[in-house]
Each structure stands twice: as structure tokens, then as C-alpha cells.
């Protein structure tokens, strides 16, 4: 079972939602964030180094202090407000004409430590430490992590009913073309039922946000150690997550661009790749990977399927077996990073 709870969100009023919303902290660098941030953008809180001229070291204490200052200011200016009661929220994301619906909730850090929240990536200590400092200083999770849960028909029905019978609190399209909608579930019985259903779900899976999840768990452990009367119900035990049903999930492509062929012709490159991969010409229509250890490649106007040959990866190597590692490790090519 997993432990979840509704919460009092600190969020923008309707009229400021699209102005406050921003891309996640780890998909753009400081210079890009500074150029992109508008006056009310959340980037001033999640990447506060942009408020210094020149841009400051993102790991310096003044930058961490600036994040706290900005979070407080956004609330005092009315750009962020806390809801009066604890709710669950439905968050919908639309991309390329396809919408997936998730539930925003608080998850328990001890479920992460026990393995009920499953992770599939290692974390970098420096990034984990950075996010931990932000959580500790803010006493809040500014960005949610992204979890998946096994499909549940009753949860699907609850979400569908709320979406059908209520206007969204937010409804806007961001600059990248992604649509964003949010509904507040204000009915207490519905919220109680969501909690009950998730108590019967054995596991959640981290889809995105390994560093933020690990950081929240570390802060929870710190607070637990300092509290001799710890019960497990304290606010510090919980962190912000948006959970999506596995059947709706679509993982966005994470592609690599090779700037040159290192002196090879396209034909020579394909010949080299054939040493480690079964290469199939898929023509001019876009091809997406169809299975584990299968990759797509666009070269000289055509799409190719690359399937790693047996022996090019070690099933016992937790890093080497990952699809993110296989293409670079076993092409026998010097690829730019």
C-alpha cells in the first residue's frame, strides 16, 4: 500500500496561471531561464540565480536565500495563494492532440525508503543536495515529481466525472505548444475515497523527478531524526507528486543529435552500426522504437531501426544494460557528447 493525502496547494489565481507557470528547473540552463522568465514566472523561485547580475552560482547561499525571498514575495503580491482546505487536484497535459490526466497529491517519504515508490535511475549527489537545500529552506515542494500508478477503473471514473461536470480552474497553452488544465476536487467524500483507493495500490513508479524525490526523502529523514515524538503523520513526511495511470502515459522523446559522422559516409556509418545492431531501413515515415534495446535513427532523409545484437550489453550491469547507454557504448564510433 502507499500513503497519500490531499493538501492545501499554494498556487496562482486563475488570471496569473499562465504567467506564473514555467518549465521544470532541469530542462533549461541559467541563461535560458533568465531570457525566458517574465515578471511573475516561477523560474525566479526554482532558478533564483537569474535574479543576480551577472548570474550567480546556483549553489551559493545568497541564491538559496533569494529563492525563499521570492517565494514569500510571490505570496505577498498575490501571485501565489494557499487554498483554504486540503484537496486533491486533477492535472491534464495535452501534447500532439493527446491528453493524459493525473492526480496531484502528497506522497509519504517512508514509502520511497521502503521501496513502495519504485525508482529506476541513480541520482547525482550534487543535484540531490541542491534540491534538498531548496526543500529544507522553503519548507515546501515548489515543483511536483511525476509518478505512475497501475490503472484503476474507479480512479478513472472519478477523474472523468470531475472533468465532465466542472470547468477547469486553469486552461492555457504554453509557448511550447503543450496544453495545461487543472481541476480542484472540492468534494470531501470524493477526496476520502481517493485516499482509500490508493491505500490498496501496492506501488508507485517514479517517471520523472528522481533527484527531487530523493531530496524530499532526505529532508523527511532529517526532520524525523529531530522529532522524538515522530508519528509519521507530520507535514514533513509528505512531498508533492502528480501521479498518472500507466495506461495513459506517453513518455516524451529524449533524443541525441550527432553533429557529424566523424569522416564516414552514410553508407559507411550504416556498415559500422551493423557490427553491433541489426539495421533495418524503415523508409521516410517516422519510426519509433518498438521494444527494449530497439532504437530509431534518422539519417540522410530516411528512418532506420537499430536493434542491439546479443552480447553488446550485459544484463547484470545496471548501467550498461540501459537503453540510454547501449547506443554510445557499442557503436565503436567516436560520437560527440
What do these predicted regions represent?
Residues 135, 209, 332:
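A residue-level signal for conserved active-site and pocket-lining positions in enzyme catalytic cores
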Residues 130, 189, 273-302:
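Metal-assisted phosphate- and nucleotidyl-transfer catalytic regions
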Residues 301, 306-329:
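C-terminal, non-catalytic macromolecule-binding modules
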Residues 236-283:
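A conserved active-site cap/scaffold subdomain adjacent to cofactor or substrate pockets
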Residues 1-160:
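N-terminal extension/subdomain marker
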Residues 184-228:
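Active-site beta-strand/loop microenvironment that shapes enzyme catalytic pockets
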Residues 330-337:
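Conserved small/polar residues in nucleotide/adenosyl-binding loops
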Residues 170-189:
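A short, charged helix-loop
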Amino acid at each position: 500500500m502507499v500513503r497519500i493525502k490531499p493538501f492545501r496547494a499554494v498556487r496562482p489565481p486563475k488570471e496569473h496561471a499562465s504567467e506564473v507557470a514555467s518549465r521544470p528547473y532541469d530542462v533549461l540552463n541559467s541563461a535560458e531561464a533568465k531570457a525566458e522568465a517574465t515578471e511573475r514566472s516561477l523560474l525566479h523561485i526554482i532558478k533564483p540565480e537569474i535574479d543576480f547580475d551577472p548570474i550567480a552560482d546556483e549553489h551559493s547561499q545568497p541564491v538559496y536565500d533569494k529563492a525563499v525571498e521570492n517565494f514569500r514575495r510571490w505570496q505577498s503580491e498575490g501571485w501565489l495563494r494557499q487554498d483554504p482546505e486540503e484537496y486533491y487536484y486533477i492535472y491534464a497535459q495535452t501534447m500532439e492532440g493527446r491528453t493524459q490526466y493525473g492526480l496531484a497529491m502528497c506522497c509519504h517519504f517512508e514509502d520511497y525508503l521502503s521501496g513502495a515508490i519504485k525508482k529506476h535511475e541513480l541520482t547525482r549527489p550534487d543535484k540531490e543536495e541542491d534540491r534538498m537545500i531548496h526543500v529544507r529552506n522553503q519548507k515546501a515542494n515548489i515543483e511536483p515529481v511525476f509518478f505512475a500508478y497501475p490503472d484503476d477503473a474507479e480512479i478513472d471514473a472519478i477523474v472523468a466525472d470531475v472533468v465532465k461536470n466542472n470547468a477547469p480552474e486553469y486552461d492555457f497553452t504554453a509557448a511550447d505548444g503543450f496544453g495545461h488544465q487543472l481541476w480542484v476536487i472540492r468534494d470531501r467524500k470524493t477526496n476520502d475515497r481517493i485516499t482509500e483507493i490508493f491505500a490498496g495500490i501496492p506501488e508507485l513508479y517514479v517517471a520523472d523527478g528522481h533527484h527531487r524525490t530523493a531530496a524530499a526523502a532526505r529532508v523527511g529523514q532529517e526532520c524525523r531524526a529531530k522529532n522524538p515524538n515522530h508519528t509519521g503523520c507530520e507535514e514533513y513526511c509528505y512531498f508533492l507528486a502528480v501521479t498518472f495511470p500507466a495506461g495513459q502515459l506517453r513518455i516524451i522523446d529524449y533524443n541525441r543529435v550527432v553533429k557529424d559522422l566523424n569522416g564516414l559516409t552514410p553508407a559507411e556509418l550504416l556498415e559500422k552500426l551493423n557490427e553491433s545492431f541489426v539495421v533495418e531501413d524503415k523508409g521516410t515515415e517516422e519510426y519509433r522504437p518498438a521494444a527494449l534495446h530497439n532504437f530509431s535513427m534518422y539519417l540522410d532523409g530516411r528512418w532506420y531501426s537499430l536493434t542491439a545484437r546479443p552480447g553488446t550489453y550485459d544484463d547484470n550491469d545496471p548501467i550498461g544494460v540501459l537503453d540510454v547507454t547501449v547506443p554510445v557504448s557499442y557503436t565503436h564510433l567516436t560520437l560527440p557528447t
